[in-house]
Regions:
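Residue-level detector of anion-binding/catalytic polar loops
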Residues: 46, 97, 141
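Conserved beta-strand signature within the Rossmann-like core of class I S-adenosyl-L-methionine
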Residues: 95-104
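A short, conserved alpha-helix within the catalytic core of class I
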Residues: 78-88, 102
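A short SAM/SAH-binding and catalytic strip from SAM-dependent methyltransferases
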Residues: 68-81
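Short conserved AdoMet
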Residues: 20, 79, 93-94
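Short "lid" loop at the C-terminus of a central beta-strand within the Rossmann-like core
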Residues: 54, 103-108, 124
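Short glycine/proline- and charge-enriched loop/turn segments
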Residues: 111-119
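Conserved N-terminal segment of class I S-adenosyl-L-methionine
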Residues: 1-68, 85, 101, 118-119, ...
């Protein structure tokens, strides 16, 4: 689906600029059809996939192994995002990138009218300030791309 590919490119294209070919990348929460993983493989990346429901192979959850980890439209579904964030950082090598895609809360007023919160599978929400706090807590640099992508860099 070309539209979904363009959607995923909002995360993939800026991440790809940071990665040499043949880097180890984990697509965490890839869902039943790992389109992003396929896109990354097509660009020469060494990609593993993990999804709690569709690709539950725990052997890919390796410490200090990945050059990049992607989590697209996932973190808002997690009941314990703090644990997931810590796991991602454990699996990420030094100088690795964690790319997260989720709509961000912009204000309390906007939240009240926000369609995104009405999806009952969305159980937690993040603002730019929250992501900045996470980056500072874990001594990460960060970059926001558009209104739904954050890339954290582990140094």
């Amino acid at each position: 689906d070309e539209g979904y590919k363009q959607f995923l490119n909002r995360l993939w294209l800026p991440l790809k600029e940071r990665l040499p070919v043949n880097q180890k990348v984990l697509d965490f929460g890839c869902g039943p059809g790992p389109l992003l993983a396929n896109m990354m493989q097509d660009e020469g990346m060494d990609v593993s996939v993990f999804d709690h429901f569709y690709h539950p192979d725990q052997s890919v959850l390796r410490a200090n192994y990945y050059d990049a980890i992607t989590a697209t439209e996932l973190i808002e579904h997690l009941h314990q995002p703090k644990q997931a964030f810590k796991l991602w950082l454990t699996m990420l090598k030094l100088n690795g990138d964690l790319a997260v895609m989720t709509k961000r809360v912009t204000s309390r007023e906007a939240f009240a009218k926000w369609h995104y919160k009405n999806d009952l599978t969305h159980v937690c929400f993040f603002s730019e300030a929250c992501f900045i706090w996470l980056a500072q807590m874990h001594q990460l640099s960060y970059e926001f791309i558009g209104n739904d992508v954050a890339i954290f860099h582990k140094t």
